[in-house]
Amino acid sequence: RKREKEIKIEFKNGIECTTKYNEREVYLLVYKKKKKNIRLLELLDKLKKERVERTEKILKKLEKYKCYISMEDLQKEVKGDLISRAHIANAMMAKGFVYSKAEAFKIYLRTGGLASEPKKELNALEAVSFIKRIGGIASLAHPKLTGLSGGTLEKLVILLKEQGLDAIEVYYPEQTQKETEIYKILCDKFGLLYTGGSDFHGMNRPDTLLGSKGISEEELTKIKNR
């Protein structure tokens, strides 16, 4: 980010957060107009602490199956300041408890797995309302992953729109062109902006290339002017 002007890449402040709607995971993209927002930072700090607590519980459960992973082991896998189940899987591979990340999730880390631990998640509607109160821009991320379609997806969009939803992520690498068009129609119907991207997650998703998907200059300008 320090080389933003030098390499001629414009950065925008934002985060992705996981929320819940009727027991389904709903992902939201939050674009911030300010670099720092005290209320948002306080919420993120709370969520970070809850994530650490969840991680510690998962590690405790893994001990029952002779998979001994310490927080120090995990730190070797983490480049940022957030620990995820993917990092736990990497640590399990490094110590020889599993052969692959897929095996770690299938047996231990997936929802319902031997060492699974439920996440404390925000309510989707309350999250959008909060984002708008702090002056952020809220976009429904990769709607395909909600598992909703047709009328049920439209109902969710209506409810989120009532709370101030600004956009839908219509461009996403793991969906068909037909699905992209469906999400564009939803945006046009409810006066929402288009967002999109490659959903790059570093080496956790090595097959997804940074910048492989994105929005046009015109679509970006609309978001900036929101």
Explain the meaning of each model-derived region.
Residues E53-G191:
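Domain-core and long-helix interface of multi-subunit machines
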Residues R1-I83, Q163, E169-F190, Y194-R205, ...:
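A metal-dependent hydrolase metal-coordination microenvironment
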Residues K95, E103-I107, S198, T208, ...:
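Flexible, active-site-adjacent loop/turn segments at secondary-structure boundaries
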Residues T19, K36-I38, S116-E117, E218, ...:
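Residues in flexible loops and secondary-structure boundaries
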Residues L156-Y171, L210-R226:
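Structural recognition of alpha->loop->beta junctions
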